[in-house]
From Swiss-Prot:
Name of this protein: UPF0246 protein PMI0005
Pfam families, alphabetized: H2O2_YaaD
Organism of this sequence: Proteus mirabilis (strain HI4320)
Sequence similarity: Belongs to the UPF0246 family.
GO cellular component term of the entry, any: cytosol
InterPro entries in the record: YaaA (IPR005583)
Length: 261
């Protein structure tokens, strides 16, 4: 079983590290090509392209300038510990993962990334902001989907083959999973959907849904799941599988309003 998740805009390069294990990203030669393109952009270009403040644009221009691919624990950090968005708040790897959990995650979890393509949890990364959906002109086209082409799909196929089955649990956002070509992916894709109750109606609430993707990732990793039927047992923080609303490989989990944290 292979899990895909999205990265996060919020980064943490300060907290104590929960593991000393690390690996190098597999697609750095492509990252270097993107960095070359990004270095051509001024701060104002970055602000416009990414729709961010001048201050954030200046920070990211500096990051592009300082980026260099000799990654060490002194100038980079493991991806699973560097990202700090809602998905990672739900996963709580730094707080809860054992060494064995990190090793299982290394084989069964992949983070899709605009700059790095595909990151394993223990892959070192330097700070960046480059969302998959932005329009960045490059030698292969006008956006990152054209740049990555089938590279991300092929990398996931290699990971699927290495870990021994063809089940992929898609916990990434649509923006990021659009970088994957399902027709060329050697996998059965499972899509969990998380619905929260609000004023008596169940719907996808972005903050809760993102956190739930992290909770589901943690559940798969800590319980060492290997069978897609086991996904229905997910019950962290009040979510319950709803068979009536699930269809095929779309698994629906619902949570009553009073159980939300």
């Amino acid at each position: 079983m292979l899990i895909t998740i999205s990265p996060a805009k919020t980064l943490d390069f300060e907290s104590p590290l929960a593991t000393t294990q690390f690996t190098q990203p597999e697609l750095l030669k492509y990252s270097q090509q993107l960095i070359t393109e990004c270095r051509k952009l001024s701060s104002s270009d970055i602000a416009s392209l990414m729709k961010i403040s001048d201050k954030l644009a200046g920070l990211n221009a500096a990051r592009f300038g300082e980026w260099q691919p000799d990654f060490t624990p002194d100038n980079a950090r493991q991806a699973i510990l560097a990202f700090k968005g809602d998905v990672y708040t739900g996963m709580q790897a730094a707080e809860l993962f054992t060494d064995d959990d990190f090793q299982f995650a290394q084989q069964h979890l992949r983070i899709l990334s605009g700059l790095y393509g595909v990151l394993r949890p223990l892959d070192l990364m330097q700070p960046y902001r480059l969302e998959m959906g932005i329009k960045l002109n490059n030698k292969k086209g006008s956006d990152l989907y054209q740049f990555w082409g089938n590279i991300i799909t092929e990398t996931l196929n290699n990971a699927l083959e290495a870990q021994g089955d063809n089940i992929l649990v898609n916990l990434a956002s649509d923006e990021y999973f659009k970088s994957v070509n399902p027709k060329k992916l050697n996998a059965e894709i499972i899509k969990p959907v998380f619905l929260d109750e609000k004023n008596g109606k169940y719907k996808v609430i972005s903050f809760y849904a993102k956190k739930a993707r992290g909770l589901m990732s943690r559940f798969i990793i800590q319980e060492r799941l290997s069978d897609k039927a086991q996904l229905k047992e997910f019950n962290l923080e009040g979510y319950q599988f709803n068979a009536a609303e699930s269809e095929g490989n779309t698994l629906v989990f619902k949570r009553a309003e009073h159980l939300a944290k």
